[in-house]
């Protein structure tokens, strides 16, 4: 009898623990029009942060590639190979938008970075070109992305302050992330 109860408890515990693994949330998009921004998620603007979660996204423009997000890193998975793209503490948002004009979307994110002294910055990852670009000014300014209508907007604030200093459309000119103000 004790043996049967022990086996039942073991099986119940096993089934309970087997259900605790991370299960990625998979999403995909329709083909990207170069004028459209695709929001994957934005935890600073309404989406819930899944601190112990994993999200995945497939884009038609990168057939066979799955972009995988963990709170602290973004990866590309293709043919069973995982390639790290960038890190954050955490990565708050990911948008897809063709900033370089090459017809392929870049990954555009707000990330926090630092240990003790933490700043918010914007990273643009050109997956097709294998290059990354950053808008940051550690200790002086914080930069955050959000989407308004069909545009990605950069908000520049004094470091650790709520006061908005500058706001404008995210643009990429001369291999540099810039804020286009009106």
Predicted regions and their residues:
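Acidic, small-residue rich beta-repeat scaffolds with periodic aromatic anchors
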Residues: 16-62, 132-182
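Acidic/hydrophobic-patterned starts of short beta strands in beta-sheet-rich repeat architectures
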Residues: 100-112, 152-153
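Bacterial N-terminal signal peptides
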Residues: 8-16
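Repeat-based blade/solenoid architectures
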Residues: 84-93, 139-146
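Positively charged n-region of N-terminal signal peptides that target proteins for export
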Residues: 1-5
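Short glycine/acidic-enriched loop and turn motifs that connect beta-strands
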Residues: 112-116, 159-161
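Calcium-binding motifs, dominated by EF-hand helix-loop-helix domains
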Residues: 95-99
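Surface-exposed loop/turn elements that mediate protein-protein interactions on large endomembrane-trafficking
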Residues: 70-87, 122-137, 166-182
